[in-house]
Amino acid sequence: LRLLDATSGEVYFRGQRLHGVEGKALRSLRQKMQIVFQDPYSSLNPRMRVGTLIGEGLKIHDLAEGAQVDRRVDELLEMVGLSSNVRSRYPHEFSGGQRQRIGIARALAVNPEFIVADEPVSALDVSVQSQILNLLIDLRKEFGLTYILISHNLAVVEHMASRVAVMYLGRIVE
């Protein structure tokens, strides 16, 4: 995603080295890959309404405008199990699980090929964790998504993953 530049090693996507990609080329690549952050409390801009947060990617990537954005945001909210009438609310008005659903909707908005799910349930109550994991699984089946799941919780990995790589000190060891 190039949120930070790599300090060592190389990252490739579809045979293209990501280091050095800039401008429109980087924006085009980012449409294909999205992220769901670990902490739903700090990953949503507190000054933006939910509808704006989710619709922002649609506008940045010229995928929709005006009423089209509103319709797509409503569709995405429903897709992740939230009512479309929450679009005008702010992130602080939601629980952690609801915020993570908003983050998932935001990631889905641009129809990515894959989503990096960085510890997507570690900051949530145990009672909510399985709901979010099951939502991610349902979305994977419905849209043919690929997830790169980052997790220290082996139960989460077992529930979600079809292939696993174990890393230690920045290297795949298993």
List the model feature ranges, each with a label.
Residues 104, 132:
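Hydrophobic anchor residue at the start of the ABC signature
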Residues 17, 67-85:
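Conserved ABC ATPase "signature" region
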Residues 90-94, 98:
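Conserved ABC ATPase signature
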Residues 109-113, 129:
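A short, proline-enriched helix->beta-strand linker immediately N-terminal to the Walker B motif
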Residues 9-17, 29:
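Conserved ABC transporter NBD signature motif
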Residues 157-159:
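A short, surface-exposed alpha-helical micro-motif characterized by mixed small hydrophobic
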Residues 31, 92, 110, 134, ...:
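Conserved signature/switch motifs of ABC ATPase nucleotide-binding domains
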